[in-house]
Regions:
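Positively charged n-region of N-terminal signal peptides that target proteins for export
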Residues: 1-4
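Conserved functional micro-motifs across diverse proteins
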Residues: 22-217
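Bacterial N-terminal signal peptides
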Residues: 7-17
């Protein structure tokens, strides 16, 4: 009987796609990624979402800002200190320097910026090259239901705090307009310059995360 079961099961396993048996494997622990910087009791890890299949509608909503040329980076902050740390998200930049191109410093986009750049150009050809970095939209048309829904969804996953509690890990997404040049992420550094211990107001040294070794996912 056991031999008969093995005779049936073994050919099925051999015929299965190589990746099928690992589809239910747990994703890697983000804190083990090599795209990190750590000092003064703070570890920061960056996980850029480089593939379209990572942009789940359940997480990011039905309107794909990735298809509009933007990328999300999931950033983890592990504060091992006894003191909380204040972060200024508005000073975070993605510094890109692909071969043969000038260095660019891209600011972190708000959910409103992402929605503007995704939805207000929805009827145009999003593949058309535009100024890089793309300028902030000015007085555009009124915001509709889709825009409100998208901004609410992105606010739910974006890095939404400027306080890193002691002995805790905080994470959230940052958004950057790559103008569809997603390969440039591998020639980029995530620059986080403005962090301060809240108890004694002492500034931390800046953090700079090389994204060259980001997983291809």
């Amino acid at each position: 009987m056991h031999r008969a079961i093995l005779t049936i099961v073994l050919p099925v396993l051999l015929l299965a796609p190589l990746g099928a048996l690992g589809q239910n494997a747990a994703p890697p622990d983000p804190m083990t990624l090599r795209t990190r910087d750590a000092h003064q009791g703070l570890t920061i890890v960056a996980d850029p979402f480089l593939k379209a299949d990572r942009y789940s509608k359940d997480v990011f909503g039905k309107n794909s800002f990735y298809n509009a040329g933007m990328v999300a980076i999931d950033v983890y902050f592990r504060n091992d200190n006894d003191s909380p740390i204040r972060l200024n998200p508005e000073t975070i930049e993605l510094v890109t320097s692909p071969p043969g191109q000038d260095r660019q410093r891209l600011g972190n986009l708000s959910p409103e910026d992402v929605a503007d750049r995704t939805l207000l150009t929805a009827n145009s050809n999003v593949r058309v090259r535009r100024p890089f970095p793309f300028p902030n939209p000015t007085n555009g048309p009124g915001h509709n239901k889709d825009w409100v829904e998208m901004t609410n969804t992105l606010h739910g996953v974006a890095l939404g705090t400027d306080i890193l509690p002691p002995h805790a890990t905080t994470h959230g997404f940052l958004f950057f307009d790559m103008n569809h040049d997603f390969g440039a992420v591998r020639y980029s550094h995530l620059f986080i310059p403005d962090l301060t211990f809240m108890t004694d107001k002492k500034a931390l040294f800046f953090f700079e995360i090389d994204l060259a070794d980001a997983p291809s996912r």
